[in-house]
């Protein structure tokens, strides 16, 4: 008897802008899901595929089995090998042991947390508790409310406490990781040179775009004293993609589960908080639409910070590090995204949008009057 797929027909995913697009990575099929779950002796019989994720960088589906719901996620092996997923899964296991509300990662009969089949790598999670209130929302879209921003700050602080003691080294070179080797360097331009040189597809893409001059200009504008600020922040493994769509929510508007650790790496708490603000306090998808001076929401950023401080104090040095990083905190992941578009997908237009609109455009906004006002308001409200 065929396994029903209730959402596979006409499946679309989020594009780089506001429009939905045909997926780069096709939806997982019932036959494919069955082949993956055959590696997990604890898996029960599949009843139906209920939902396919609209996220563009991988494919994922919620599967109804006779013993509950599972999430099966597929990655192209050029993006995540089994070893790359194991880096994430070891961090998640540490967080779970410390009491953090994270997904339960299933292991195969051989004890592995990922399965490699053909050109793909798969992971299987038990469906985590909580409502996926933001699952259809694009990245860089704000919280629904200041209460959600505050709750997200509380949850982030608790996650950072759970992360303490996890001493794994930084992740291996691979696409779509928010690593922390450029901003933390005493010479960020030299670190950027090394980053690009280690990624041939990225280097080839950037070759015609005067990238050294343009990055040097950004570091000159925003990098002074940055390494000194960061040097005082304790290293910590962090989530690095703190957006409400990566949180499952309880009925009382608190965070029930934290998921999607794909961008996680060793950085510091200030870096993770800066990313959280960059992801949630700006309507970046409206940038260039004629009202750039109105895309920022300092109240949301301050609510996030207040929630964090309800659990963990933010001293003046940490707060200054967060503010100093904000104009550049996206740079390393933007380069990683360009590497993905150039080296894995072969989508030059998306790569150009990531370079011009994301990496350069977001940083340039902070140099505008509205951007400088936003940073000044954070400082003033924090009495720095």
Cite the ranges covered by each PLM segment.
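A cross-family kinase active-site recognition segment
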Residues: 12, 142-207, 235
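Active-site activation/catalytic loop segments of kinase-like enzymes and analogous catalytic loops
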Residues: 270-312, 327-346
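Active-site acidic catalytic loop and adjacent metal/ATP-binding pocket
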Residues: 56-66, 71-72, 105, 220-271
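ATP/Mg2+ or Mg2+-diphosphate-binding catalytic cores
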Residues: 21, 332-384
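Juxta-kinase regulatory segment immediately upstream of eukaryotic protein kinase catalytic domains
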Residues: 2-47
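A glycine-centered beta->alpha junction motif in the catalytic cores
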Residues: 125-141, 195-200, 331-347
């Amino acid at each position: 008897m065929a396994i029903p797929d209730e959402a596979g027909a006409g499946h679309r995913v989020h594009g780089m802008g506001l429009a939905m697009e045909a997926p780069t990575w096709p939806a997982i099929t019932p036959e494919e899901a069955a082949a993956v779950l055959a590696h997990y002796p604890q898996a029960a019989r599949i009843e139906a595929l209920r939902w396919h994720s609209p996220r563009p960088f991988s494919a994922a589906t919620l599967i109804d089995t006779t013993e509950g719901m599972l999430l099966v996620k597929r990655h192209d092996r050029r993006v995540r090998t089994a070893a790359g997923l194991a880096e994430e899964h070891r961090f998640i296991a540490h967080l779970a042991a410390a009491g953090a509300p994270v997904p339960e990662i299933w292991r195969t009969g051989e004890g592995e947390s990922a399965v490699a089949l053909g050109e793909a790598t798969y992971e299987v999670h038990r469906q985590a508790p909580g409502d996926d209130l933001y699952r259809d929302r694009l990245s860089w879209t704000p919280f629904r409310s200041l209460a959600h921003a505050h709750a997200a700050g509380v949850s982030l602080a608790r996650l950072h406490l759970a992360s303490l003691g996890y001493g794994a080294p930084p992740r291996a070179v691979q696409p779509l990781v928010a690593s922390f080797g450029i901003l933390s360097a005493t010479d960020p331009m030299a670190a950027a040179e090394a980053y690009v040189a280690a990624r041939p597809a990225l280097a080839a893409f950037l070759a015609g775009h005067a990238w050294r001059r343009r990055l040097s200009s950004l570091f000159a504008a925003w990098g002074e004293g940055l390494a000194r600020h960061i040097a005082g922040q304790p290293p910590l493994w962090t989530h690095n993609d703190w957006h409400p769509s990566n949180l499952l929510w309880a009925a009382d508007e608190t965070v029930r589960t934290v998921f999607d650790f794909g961008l996680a790496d060793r950085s510091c708490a200030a870096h993770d908080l800066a990313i959280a603000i960059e992801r949630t306090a700006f309507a970046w998808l409206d940038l260039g639409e004629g009202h750039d001076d109105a895309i920022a929401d300092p109240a949301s950023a301050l609510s996030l910070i207040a929630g964090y401080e309800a659990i963990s104090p933010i001293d003046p040095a940490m707060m200054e590090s967060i503010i100093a990083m904000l104009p550049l905190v996206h740079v390393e992941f933007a380069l990683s995204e360009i590497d993905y578009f150039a080296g894995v997908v072969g989508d030059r237009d998306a790569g150009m949008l990531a370079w011009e609109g994301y990496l350069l455009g977001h940083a340039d906004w902070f140099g505008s009057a509205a951007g400088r006002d936003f940073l000044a308001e954070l400082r003033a409200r924090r009495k720095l």
